[in-house]
Amino acid sequence: HLGTTVAEILGDDKVSGVLLQNGDELSCDMLIFAIGITPNIDLVKDTAVETNKGIVVDKHMRTSVNGIYAAGDVAEGYDLLFKKNRVLATLPNAYKQGEIAGLNMAGVPAVFAGGFAYNAISFFGFPIITAGLQGAEGNIREEVEIDEETCTYKKIIFKDDNIIGFIFLNDVDRAGILTGIIRDSLDVGEFKGHLADMKFGYASFPKKLRKERLFGGV
């Protein structure tokens, strides 16, 4: 069912199906929304503020008009993985962009170093965290671990000697470590094997790097 979308949700007390814009009806017991985000930029339409999919900003979250800033889902911030500005519609990125915009508006120079896609949610008691790129091209290696007994699923995506994404289901304890590795574009070639076995921790890092991550190099 391509080239169409949901026009109406069917059912009274619970969902029984959907009506598509092309007139087709589909029966279902569950409806999951995952159709992406299109920023509402009507506020700056037909103005001097430059827009693309979202409002175009620089590393200080400034728009093309002096004195006007934008942040959050409506702005196109720098994506560390795509290496270009794009909409980063997640709460952590919105918080950081808002902070940077606020500091600069208050006269305190600040730079948005960049972000990437990151989502955390819980379905039916199962925590899920996803981050980074899925379906990337190039020298890609994916490490997957599935444990049916504990209902856990883990996938880490490597490109060369960098981690560019991961998916964790029902065991998200090490997601913070991976998020930091992606954010800082760390070369993990020296300890990639430890990361791939899914039982890693800071103890798996080389001594110098472990010291930097835990104590800031002190």
Provide a role label for each language-model segment:
Residues 49-51, 110, 188:
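Residue-level detector of short coil/turn "hinge" positions at structural boundaries
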Residues 1-6:
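A conserved beta-strand/loop element that lines the FAD pocket in flavoprotein oxidoreductases
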Residues 8-19, 24-100, 192-195:
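FAD-site-proximal beta/loop scaffold in flavoenzymes
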Residues 101-105, 185, 198:
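C-terminal alpha-helix
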Residues 188-218:
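Cysteine/selenocysteine-centered motifs that mediate thiol-based redox chemistry or coordinate metal-sulfur cofactors
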Residues 45, 139, 177-178:
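Extended hydrophobic-aromatic, low-complexity segments
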Residues 172-190:
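A short, polar/charged loop-to-alpha-helix boundary motif
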Residues 74-174:
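Mid-to-C-terminal Rossmann-like scaffold of FAD/NAD(P)H-dependent oxidoreductases
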